[in-house]
Amino acid sequence: MKYPDFTLENKLSGVIAGVDEVGRGPLAGPVISAAVVFIDRNTIIDGINDSKKLTPQCRQVLYEKITSVAKFGIGMASVEEINSYNILQATKLSMKRALIDLDLELDYVLVDGNQPPEVKWQVKSIVNGDNLSTSIAAASIVAKVTRDRLMQELHNKHPEYNWYKNKGYGTKEHLNAIGLYGITEHHRKNFAPISRAL
């Protein structure tokens, strides 16, 4: 398996943040972004990869390692903001907030995908960036673990939707629960399965 590395970061100079989001697709819960900066790019953390390729246990271990050696920021766009704008604009807002939370003077921002937020720093969009850049892959892990923990908290309040397992995604189980119990304030009302249930 090929792992991300610092090739992209090393082609640039200065302080470089990797940014990624988690939670664009679910029917419930916020979208979360993380920004990660490895000040020392000689830092080696074995196993960093796109969070979708890792087990939950592996993500937890890597999260602890990443957050102990790297600078990081977290940004969230709420369900209310997703409902008010749209998921793309809410995602950009969460990315911008993650960079603000990072609270560093940056030279470049590497963003996974091709729809970056408008920020004051130089931005490079990297399609499949979480497979290429260690900074972006690390951000994907931090964002994923952060959102999973939040969905666990929401699950404790609404166990009937089993968000602990489905993380708010539109699984058959989740859709069946919506049919049985209706929707909560944590559901995204402008997403088709939810808007049809209103």
Swiss-Prot record:
Residue stretches spanning the membrane: none
PROSITE patterns reported in the protein's UniProt record: RNASE_H_2
This enzyme's EC code(s): 3.1.26.4
Enzyme category, top tier: hydrolase
GO molecular function, one term: RNA-DNA hybrid ribonuclease activity
GO cellular component: cytoplasm; ribonuclease H2 complex
SUPFAM superfamilies, alphabetized: Ribonuclease H-like (SSF53098)
Cofactor note: Manganese or magnesium. Binds 1 divalent metal ion per monomer in the absence of substrate. May bind a second metal ion after substrate binding.
Pfam families: RNase_HII
Cofactor(s) needed for function: Mn(2+); Mg(2+)
Protein's UniProt keywords contain Hydrolase: yes
Any GO BP: DNA replication, removal of RNA primer
Domain of life where this protein originates: Bacteria
Reaction catalysed by this enzyme: Endonucleolytic cleavage to 5'-phosphomonoester
InterPro entries documented for this protein: RNase_HII, RNase_HII/HIII, RNase_HII/HIII_dom, RNaseH-like_sf, RNaseH_sf
Compartments in which it is found: Cytoplasm
UniProt entry keywords in alphabetical sequence: Cytoplasm, Endonuclease, Hydrolase, Manganese, Metal-binding, Nuclease
Domain RNase H type-2, residue spans: 14-198
Similarity section: Belongs to the RNase HII family.
Primary role: Endonuclease that specifically degrades the RNA of RNA-DNA hybrids.
Protein name: Ribonuclease HII
Organism: Wolbachia pipientis wMel
Name of the gene this protein is made from: rnhB
